Amino acid sequence: MATGDLKRSLRKLEQVLRSLNYPNEVDYVGLMKGDTAASLPIISYSLTSYSPHVAELLMESNIELIAKNDVRFTDTVYKLLRDQFDYKPILTKKQFIQSGFAEWKIEIVCDILNCVMKKHKKLIGLDKNSSCQRKKSISEKPEPCSSREKCPAEAVGIDVTGRFMTSGKKKAVVIRHLYTEENVGVPEGTVTSTEVSEGCDELEEQSSDIRIPEAQAPEVKAELQDMCDNPELTALQIALAECQEKLKKLTWIEKRLECLEATTKGKVMVDEKAWNNILSRVTLLETEMLLSKKNESVEPNTTSEDSESVSGVDVVPYDKKYSVEGPASTCHSSGYSTVSSATVPRSSTINYCGLNNFSEETTMQKMERMKKMFEETAELLKCSSR
C-alpha cells in the first residue's frame, strides 16, 4: 500500500470530521496501522450523538449500539448500513475486525459518515414538510370553541386566513379592508390582523418543535385540560403513583424476608452475650470434668496407700507383743502393756474412715454442682430457641 494513498484518505477523513463537528481526539496512529479500536468511536458518535433524527430512527428500528463489544457492534453496524442506508462495505466483518486494511477501513468510515449526514438532511426535510402540512391543515380548519370554555363576548375579528381572533388582551382587532388607506382612524392600542397572524405563526413554529404524534395530539390536549381543570384529581393520581411505588418496595421486602427465612430455616439464633456465656460455662464444665477424672484416678491410689499404712500399723504392735512378752508381764501392775498395744491400731483405723467420708462428700458436691450447671445451660438454650 502506498503511503500517499493513506495520507490522502486521512485528509479526506479530517475534512469529513470537521463537517461532522467531531469533538473527541482521533487516533491517527491506530488508523494508519489498521486498528479497529481507532475507527469504532467515530462510527458510534456519528450514529448515536451527531443527529437526533438518526438516533430516533435507530430507536424506532430497535437497534442498540451502546454497551456492546467490538464484534457485536460491527455486526449491528453492518446490518444497519444494509437495511437503513443501502450501503455495502468493501471489507467483510472479519476483515474489518482484523488488524490491517488501513486504507479500506478509512474509506469505509468516510462513507459511513457521509451516509449519516445525507440521512440527517433527508430527515430534516421530511420534518419541515410535515410541519408545513400541519400549518396548512390548521389554517384551513377553524378552531371551534369547546363546551367547557365560554367564548368571551368581546370584539371578534376574522383574519384573511379564516381564523377566529378574540380580544384576549384588551386590544381591539381591526379587520384588514381592501382599500389602501394608510392607518385611517386606527387608535393607538389596536393591533392589525396581520400582526396577530404573524404571532400565531410564531407560536405554531414553537409548538411544532414539541413533537407529538398526530393521532395522540387530541388525547394529550384533553389530558392537559383535565389536569388544569381538576387539580384534586391530579393530586390523587400523584398519591396513587407514590402508593404503587411503596407497594413495589413492600413486595421486594417480602421477597427478601422469604429468602432470609429459607436460608435460616432449621437454625437457632442466639444472642452474642448468651452465646459467650454458654461457651464459658461449657469450658468450665469441661475443666471440672477433667479435674474430677484426675481426682477419681488419684483416690484409688490414696486408698491403696492408706490400706498399706493401716496394715503396717496393725502388724507392728502384734510383733511387739510377741517379741516383748517377758517385760510385759513385769509391767502388769501399771496396766500399760495390753491397753497401749490395743489402742494404737484403733485410732489409726478411725482416722482412715474419716478421710474416706470426707472424699465421698466432696465428690457428691462436685456432682451436684455439675448437675446445676447442666440444668442452667439447658434453660439458656431453651430461652434462646424461643
Swiss-Prot record:
It comes from the Eukaryota. This is Centrosomal protein of 44 kDa. It is found in: Cytoplasm, Cytoskeleton, Microtubule organizing center, Centrosome; Cytoplasm, Cytoskeleton, Microtubule organizing center, Centrosome, Centriole; Cytoplasm, Cytoskeleton, Spindle pole; Midbody. Keywords: Coiled coil, Cytoplasm, Cytoskeleton, Phosphoprotein. Centriole-enriched microtubule-binding protein involved in centriole biogenesis. In collaboration with CEP295 and POC1B, is required for the centriole-to-centrosome conversion by ensuring the formation of bona fide centriole wall. Functions as a linker component that maintains centrosome cohesion. Associates with CROCC and regulates its stability and localization to the centrosome. GO terms for biological process: centriole replication; centriole-centriole cohesion; centrosome cycle. The keyword Phosphoprotein applies. Interacts with CROCC. Interacts with POC1B; the interaction is direct and recruits POC1B to centriolar microtubules. Binds to centriolar microtubules. InterPro entries: CEP44 (IPR033603), CEP44_CC (IPR029157). One of its GO terms (molecular function) is microtubule binding. The keyword Nucleus does not apply. It holds the Pfam family CEP44. Transmembrane segments: none annotated. GO terms for cellular component: centriole; centrosome; cytoplasm; midbody; spindle pole. It comes from Rattus norvegicus.
